[in-house]
Curated annotation (Swiss-Prot):
The record marks 15 as: Not N6-methylated. The nucleosome is a histone octamer containing two molecules each of H2A, H2B, H3 and H4 assembled in one H3-H4 heterotetramer and two H2A-H2B heterodimers. The octamer wraps approximately 147 bp of DNA. The H3K9meK27me dimethylated N-terminal tail of histone H3 can directly interact with the chromodomains of CMT3 and/or LHP1. Interacts with AHL27. Binds to HIRA. The modification N6,N6,N6-trimethyllysine is found at residues 5, 10, 28, 37. Keywords: Acetylation, Chromosome, DNA-binding, Methylation, Nucleosome core, Nucleus, Phosphoprotein. Can be acetylated to form H3K9ac, H3K14ac, H3K18ac and H3K23ac. H3K9ac could compete with H3K9me and prevent gene silencing. H3K9acK14ac molecules are 30-fold less abundant than H3K9ac or H3K14ac. Very low level of H3K9meK14ac. H3K14 is specifically acetylated by HAG1 and deacetylated by HDA6. H3K9ac is deacetylated by HDT1. H3K9ac is restricted to euchromatin. H3K18ac, but not H3K9ac, is cell-cycle dependent and linked to replication. Reduced H4R3me2s increases H3K14ac in the FLC chromatin and activates or maintains its transcription. Mono-, di- or trimethylated to form mainly H3K4me1/2/3, H3K9me1/2/3 and H3K36me1/2/3. Very low monomethylation at H3K18me1 or H3K23me1. H3K4me1/2/3, H3K9me3, H3K27me3 and H3K36me1/2/3 are typical marks for euchromatin, whereas heterochromatic chromocenters are enriched in H3K9me1/2 and H3K27me1/2. H3K27me3 is largely restricted to the transcribed regions of single genes and not associated with low-nucleosome density regions. SUVR1 to SUVR5, ASHH1 to ASHH3 and ASHR1 to ASHR3 methylate H3, with ASHH2 methylating specifically H3K4 and H3K36. The modification Phosphoserine is found at residues 11, 29. The modification Phosphothreonine is found at residue 12. The modification N6-acetyllysine is found at residues 10, 15, 19, 24. The record marks 32 as: Impaired recognition by ATXR5 and ATXR6. This is Histone H3.3.
Amino acid sequence: MARTKQTARKSTGGKAPRKQLATKAARKSAPTTGGVKKPHRYRPGTVALREIRKYQKSTELLIRKLPFQRLVREIAQDFKTDLRFQSHAVLALQEAAEAYLVGLFEDTNLCAIHAKRVTIMPKDIQLARRIRGERA
C-alpha cells in the first residue's frame, strides 16, 4: 500500500486524557505482599483446546479399566448371576463403548454448532440419537 502524507486534523472532542500520576504514585507506595506470586492461569478455553488436541492424537482408553469392569458386571447381574468374563471380553466391550461415545459426542457437537452454540446440551444428545435412529 502506498504511503500518504499525514496532515494535522482538528480534534472534535472525544475522551479526555487520563491522569496517571495519582495511580502510579499509589501503586508504588502500596505495600508488597512479601513476594507471594499469583498462580499462573490460562485464558478460558486454552486448556480445553490443548486437551482436545491431546486426546485426538492418543489411542489409549479414556475410561479406567476397573470402574468399567465393575459397571459391566453390575449390568450383567440383571441378566444372569455368577457370570464370568474373560479379560479380553471386557476390553472389547470397553473399546466398543468408548468408540460409540466418541462418535455420539462428535454428532452432539455438530448439533450444538448447528444451533449456533459451542456448549453441548442434553437436547443435542437427544437430537443426535434421534437422527441416528437409536431412539424414536
